[in-house]
Amino acid sequence: RDYYASRGLGDVYKRQTLVNAILAICKNSLSGIGGEIRPGIVHRLDKDTSGIIIVAKNDIAHINISNQIKERKVKKTYIALVRGNVPEEEATINMPIGRSTRDRKKMAVNKDGKPAITHFKVLKRYGKYTLLEVKIETGRTHQIRVHMAEIGYPIVGDAVYSNGKNEFGVEGQMLHAYKLEFEHPTTKKHMELIAPLPQYFKEILEKLY
């Protein structure tokens, strides 16, 4: 294999960084493109977003998958719990995202920003909350979080874009990178990798029934 698919490492290494967890598991069998800071890491997940991430074992695989991401050939699917009852069964958000003019540490919908496209579909409604399947065409920083907050349905637990509300006391936003689809860099086979929801996410959904 030319890559590792890390599923929920945060559950095992709660008090360590993703890099430490990867090094503990993979040792020296990693792509060197990212250097010591990001060994083998091909793409990113927002801080406190759970789920799957691809780590390349060699430079060829790293470059191949990076190119697939740039060409929008990698399909990313997320599961998100948002605040509010989303009326549409499915919809597309097409709003450019750039650095916030009010707070440079945050991102925001900005007419001068880069194109950002997010698709979502309702999986289940829980009164004041809605569970969504979210797919992104672009990979802007904080894209899903910014888009959902912009249309009035912020992600539960998002300390940055949800006005500080955290009604379930979760550590981070309830946004989970559920599935990745891409072409294997060597065999060219279609790959579909899934990371099940974390236990805390499942428990909160059970409470909402």
Residue map of PLM features:
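Helical mechanochemical/support elements of P-loop NTPase systems and associated helical scaffolds
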Residues: 14-18, 41, 61, 89, ...
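Short helix-loop capping/hinge motifs at secondary-structure junctions, enriched
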Residues: 28-30, 60-62, 86-88, 187
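Single conserved hydrophobic/aromatic residue that forms the stacking wall/gate
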Residues: 1-13
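RNA substrate-recognition surfaces in RNA-acting enzymes
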Residues: 156-185
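The conserved catalytic core of RNA pseudouridine synthases
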Residues: 35-67, 75, 79, 95-151, ...
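Signal for well-folded cores of large energy- and translation-related assemblies
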Residues: 23, 27, 69-70, 98
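Internal amphipathic helical hairpin motif
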Residues: 17-33
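Flexible glycine-rich active-site/ligand-binding loops centered on an Asp-His dyad
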Residues: 71, 75, 79, 83, ...
